[in-house]
Swiss-Prot record:
The lineage of its organism: Eukaryota, Metazoa, Chordata, Craniata, Vertebrata. Residues 21-30 have a biased composition (Acidic residues). Belongs to the CD225/Dispanin family. This is Transmembrane protein 233. GO terms for cellular component: membrane; plasma membrane. The keyword Cell membrane applies. Residues 1-41, 63-84 are cytoplasmic. It is a single-pass membrane protein. The keyword Disulfide bond does not apply. Pfam families: CD225. Interacts with the giant stinging tree toxin ExTxA (AC P0DQP3). Interacts with Nav1.7/SCN9A. Interacts with Nav1.1/SCN1A, Nav1.2/SCN2A, Nav1.3/SCN3A, Nav1.4/SCN4A, Nav1.5/SCN5A, and Nav1.6/SCN8A. The chain crosses the membrane at residues 85-105.
Length: 109
């Protein structure tokens, strides 16, 4: 029976193996997810400025993918770009709607 008992050297080697060390699993600090403004870019897709709001949606998705890849600074930068492009798209869309309504109602008046 003594031949099946683990020796002290075996226990020491097992305790120092990387698979047995679970304390190092939490060495990465948890970085909070930066805002990617996905909801804003989806809302901007309803405005009639189609090439611009599609670019905002792409920036937002790229921000999410950058965060998942571990590029936190790139995710923050792309999220900020998505926000400003979506705001520009909404403003341009509202201008297009306003101008088309003004032209329509002044012609038929």
């Amino acid at each position: 029976m003594s031949q099946y008992a683990p020796s002290p050297d075996f226990k020491r080697a097992l305790d120092s193996s990387p698979e047995a060390n679970t304390e190092d699993d939490k060495t990465e600090e948890d970085v909070p997810m930066p805002k990617n403004y996905l909801w804003l870019t989806i809302v901007s897709c309803f405005c009639p400025a189609y090439p611009i709001n599609i670019v905002a949606l792409v920036f937002s998705i790229m921000s999410l993918n950058s965060y998942n890849d571990g590029d936190y600074e790139g995710a923050r930068r792309l999220g900020r770009n998505a926000k400003w492009v979506a705001i520009a798209s909404i403003i341009i869309g509202l201008l297009i709607i306003g101008i088309s309504c003004a032209v329509h109602f002044t012609r038929n008046a």
